[in-house]
């Protein structure tokens, strides 16, 4: 039996860690690759979604005909940005990025990025996050080159993932749920998101996922659970469970 909200086995349901939902005043959109949708054992996009109020998951490989996505992109109350690294990517400290958050008719606010009037008239930031492996992320970009025409946003700082049982292609690569967490923290530092927003549930549920997964893998190695991997050296030794 699976939970139909977090899509994890009932035994390992994580929904209780997602309440109350985080309302950061940001609309997160997750473009979830079909393979990621099937890998709910360790996927973090759905966990991020159930933690974040006003977030949406759009599943697929080809999004050029996705009416929901284009309705969102065409809504002037949102500022859509693609969370994607690159030399042309902004970060939250970039003045040009901050100015984009202001409506075109708010010239008087453009030099007052943290004033009450500027904050009250800001557009809602809408980060678009590709939820997939890095290989599948490239496939989504290949099939949807229009995404690269969106403003790109990346981190102002470097972060390392705590996803201990996954090997990212580069040290600076982080999971979907970590992306949401670090983005909210940087937006708070830039005074774009309110200081009283608590983003910690994202990391709490993520750490619980890691601990549960490693504990289950260790039980398989010990013969306490049926193995689903056959013989694979990655899954035939006891792993240390981090003390977060």
Question: Where does each model-flagged region fall?
Answer:
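Short, glycine/acidic-enriched capping/hinge loops at junctions between secondary-structure elements
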Residues: 14-17, 39-44, 94
């Amino acid at each position: 039996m699976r939970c139909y909200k977090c899509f994890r086995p009932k035994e390992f349901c994580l929904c209780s860690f997602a309440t109350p939902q985080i309302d950061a005043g940001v609309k997160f959109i997750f473009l979830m690759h079909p393979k990621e949708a099937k890998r709910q054992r360790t996927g973090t996009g759905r966990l991020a979604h159930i933690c974040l109020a006003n977030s949406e998951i759009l599943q697929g490989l080809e999004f050029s005909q996705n009416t929901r996505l284009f309705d969102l992109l065409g809504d002037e109350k949102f500022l859509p940005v693609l969370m994607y690294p690159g030399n042309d990517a902004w970060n939250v400290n970039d003045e040009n990025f901050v100015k984009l958050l202001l409506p075109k008719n708010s010239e008087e606010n453009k030099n007052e990025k943290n004033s009450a009037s500027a904050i009250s008239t800001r557009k809602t930031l809408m980060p678009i996050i590709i939820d997939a492996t890095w290989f599948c992320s490239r496939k989504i970009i290949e099939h949807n080159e229009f995404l690269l025409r969106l403003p790109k946003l990346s981190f102002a700082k470097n972060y390392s993932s705590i996803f201990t049982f996954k090997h990212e292609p580069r040290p600076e690569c982080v999971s979907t749920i970590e992306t949401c967490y670090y983005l909210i923290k940087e937006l708070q530092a830039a005074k774009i998101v309110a200081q009283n927003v608590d983003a910690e549930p994202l990391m709490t549920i993520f750490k619980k996922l890691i601990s549960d997964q490693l504990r289950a893998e260790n039980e398989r190695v010990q013969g306490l659970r049926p193995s689903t991997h056959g013989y694979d050296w990655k899954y035939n030794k006891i792993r240390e469970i981090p003390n977060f």
